[in-house]
Curated annotation (Swiss-Prot):
This is ATP-dependent helicase/deoxyribonuclease subunit B. Residues 1-278 form the UvrD-like helicase ATP-binding domain. Pfam families: ADDB_N, PDDEXK_1, UvrD_C. Despite having conserved helicase domains, this subunit does not have helicase activity. It comes from the Bacteria. It comes from Listeria monocytogenes serovar 1/2a (strain ATCC BAA-679 / EGD-e). Belongs to the helicase family. AddB/RexB type 1 subfamily.
Amino acid sequence: MTLQIIAGRSGTGKTTHLMDEVGEKIKQNSKTYIFIVPDQMTFQMETSFLNKENLAGMLGTQIFSFSRLAWKILQETGGLSKTFLSQTGIEMVIRKAALDQKDKLKIFSRATSRKGFYSELANLFKEMKQEEVSIEDMVKSATNLSTSVNNKVHDISLIYQKYEELLADKFLENEDYLRLLAEKIADSDYLNQTEIVIDGFTSFSKQELTVIGELMRKCDKVTISLTLNVPEIQHGLDEYSMFKASTEAYYALLELAKLNGTQVEENKFFLENKRAKTESLAFLANTWGHNKFMSFKNEPQNLKIHQANNRRAEIEGIAREIRQQALNGYRYRDIAILTRNLGDYDVLCETVMEAYNIPTFIDKKRAMAKHPFIEFIRSSLDAILFNWKYEPIFQAVKTEFFFDITEKSSLNRRKADILENYVLENGIQNKWKWEKEGDWIYRKIRGLSTNVLPQTDEEIHMQSIINEMRNLIVNPLSTLELNLRKAKTGMEFALALYHYLEQVNAVERLESWRQRAEEQGYLELAREHEQAWSSISALLDEFVEVLGEETLDLDSFTEIIGTGLDALEFSLLPPSLDQVVLSDMENAKLLDMKVIFAIGMNDGVMPLRQKDKGIFSDQDRDALRAEDSKLKPSAKNNIGEEDLLAYKIISLPSDKLFLSYPAADEEGKVLSESNYLRKIKGQFNELNESVYLTDPSLLSDAEQSSYIRSKQATLGLLTSQLQMYKRGYTLSSVWWDAYNSYFENEKESIMAKQVLSSLYYENKTKPLQETTAKNLFGETIHASVSRMEKFFSCEFQHYAQYGLKLEERGHFQLQAVDMGEIFHGAMEWISAELKRNNLDWGNLTEEECKQMAKLAMTFLAPKIQHEILLSSKRMEYIQYKLLQIITRATTVLNEQAKSSAFRPVGLEVDFGLKGDIPPLKIPLQSDSELLLQGRIDRIDMAEQDDRTFLRIIDYKSSSHDLALTEVYYGLALQMLTYLDIVVTNAQKMIGKTAEPAGVLYFHMHNQYVQAEKELSDEAIAKELQKSSKMKGLILSDPVAVSLMDMTLEKGKASTIIPAEIKQNGELSARSRTATRAEFDKMRQFVRHKYQEAGNKILDGAVSINPYKLKERTPCQFCSFRSFCGFDPSLTSNQYRHLANEKAETILTKMDIEGGTQ
């Protein structure tokens, strides 16, 4: 029984020597030779043995990790009677233990709901077993420490003891195998006449040392290779050396051999670097970690440092380098990319390497959490926990597991969208609404529904879809909730979930997905679907095995299962025979690599800026170790580990080493280079840093040609270069050659034409063909005023809404338009109620105004937006505030009526084919016509002598005024149109002709009076009346004005209308008035605008042409902004800037342009 240690720096030939030595021994005897290497290294070592000619295909040799050797020996000696717990199972059991002890925890009670907490606890328990630290020892070490550390250890002790109790000596963790292995080695016949070779470790845990000790006793020989600096073991341990851990392992092995009485053969020390093929790489590896500064005198060969603008530029530069190395004769398997933060680069690398046609293996396990099956389970449980809220329900729906498996996915998705729209619009946010008896009723009504017509065929069809999809969700989910609510034990909870998955045909759906992915060539995706089911099956089996008989509640079950779901990962396929490997630096176990790219070499990353992580902080660890705890040292006491990691990278390649870093992150934040790069540049005076550019145009032609490495990737660069050429920059002939190369075969030319077409892209629309326009809008255009205003705001906005009939998804929320409808509805209801009771405005008391407003709100509240005003306490408060506004408006209108001769003669008057008044007909080109239809809020009439006046009142929830500029540009046609219609149809409406008296906006709001001193009730009333003054435009006729405000005196301004009388009895310039002739011109001009719009619509006008008036644009509140893609930075997308001109100028233009109809 002997021990031999092989020691030396990386690349000195230790592994090669061991393999060659075993190869020679196999020829001479029949012994078994067992290599033990780290878990991540077994595949590479097996590959190396297969490629080693003198080992005859591995006959007589076996490759194990410590855990795989444990399985082998325990299978032989009978130590596998206990159930193995995976990492997922461990975290679930720890969560159960923590939940059971939650009330007793002093410091971790809140952490029990923190994501990652159980993973950290699992890592701590793993460390305790590896380092053979008992919980009793830890408690003892913490006795004299701070309250914080004491409380932490107290909580850990409670959780750990409960955890061990739940395992109940029936289950095994990975670390338990090493303990059992150490116990069973002596009983193994397999290990008789064997020699053990241990390679690839930089240090050993206490458990591993115990196993090695037993192997020393059992096996003929144990040979162990260690990477260290030979002079250090000859001159004693250096606390700050990067080889500290290896040197400690060296002394520990010698001590172990001494304790076991094992003979120590003469150690072999390897000093010469045999891996590096260039003097510069050998120098870098040999001098790394030396205290004495040494510099390299010549220009370094095959050692490069690159800066990149950002991470994408860095990866694209590396992809070009890899393509060049492949052209130079290297295989992809000879190349590896290493990074400290794989999460910063994995997705980017995958995308870029695919574009450069570089086969790449990303050595990173991906979490299963985003797989639809895992999301379905989690969302289903969340839906039950949170009373069937919208978010978890539809997260589950969108995974498609509720759908009928026999129907097409696209059809099911469409039906699910219809259901989702209904749920959002109707505010279905709880279980009671989902499970309520009877079908859900579908009505395509938005806003106020006071007059509900019978359902249409379309509504009945939509209703059947909604209820079909509703039942697909409610039936299985209700059953799941029922079974979960009845469950008491872990077994019953697991069965409830399993039966739910059976009910939705989860296995069949995953299998159909797997088959489809396989048929389409997505083999990795097919494996993921397969693993998803097997992982959930294993998780439930493990859950039942450990917690099946435990009493649980629903919250505990979902938390524990949630922990298990978080821990699930997809297993990795080993890399193919010829792929570039992308791996993280710390876990990479690579052999025989010729070219290494170390990326992301930034300050704070290499060396890592240490942060506390895990259950114990660095300070906690230092304190516990000071009390003889055997926990691992804190990060700050492992100063040499960062140097060792860097050493591992720079000593890995035999041929070439590329080091790179980005100068900025994705957000443009500046990133500095690593201190290690500064150190290397200091050692190599002739080493020049290069730059990976996003724009190579400033480089020489030869350098620019290096950017052309693959057809797909080059096409993007070519596009950007041609874009610069369009702007007047010089273009290298390199890019013209690249351009021509794309048109040498048909397939590439098609791809190139598609991509390069973006050079000439303009975000413009073409006019619709005449037949298309007529099919969309009809030969007779039935339009509303607001639709025409939308056309003049932006033609494309009109096309999207009225041509394509796009509309925003409805939401169960009270919007400004809904409040406007409530105000209109209230005023209509109150006016109608007054008429029914033979009452008139101006004759009501304040109390009657309040009562009328209250009755109106009681009538309207259930009829707005699916009873939204009755849906919550918050909505009840909003209803109260709306009632205040309606009450105030009723009071003001009543007060105004006392001073006015005008009285309503029409409320909510419809005009159109089925209206009280016929539509406004506008003749269009080609014998077409435009029929204008709509509803007028209120029409008032007043008479004096033989003159009759009509005016329009419009209720607004925000402040409005009539701007002639907006009328001229077609943005505010409503009021003058309504006035034109009522004046034109006065004979039909009131039996006589009438004059236009004006158009006025009544602002419905709850006014407040601001004053610097206390005011009387009368003064307050006066101020409130002023703030309620209507805005708009009125007839500049003393008779009409006096009828509107009979209290108006000379030298005073009206508190009702926008009028002011001078001392001489004339209207002042501050009045907002127009003459009868001007009103007629405006009415005529408005008709002209409708004719203009109608003809343009028939001509197919769909331009993206939003206006800009002052700072206002229709894009601010446009639902179609993302759809049209309007971008003012593009030459093809510019606003129509509208001039804000004086009223006199506008009226003159209207007169000139209005013409005659």
